[in-house]
């Protein structure tokens, strides 16, 4: 289940990156 936990962490990091990109008007990272 460790890989599952890592996937959650990665998703949270991508969400944070998307928030930053959105704040500067860039399209979100998929």
From Swiss-Prot:
This protein's name: Tail tubular protein A
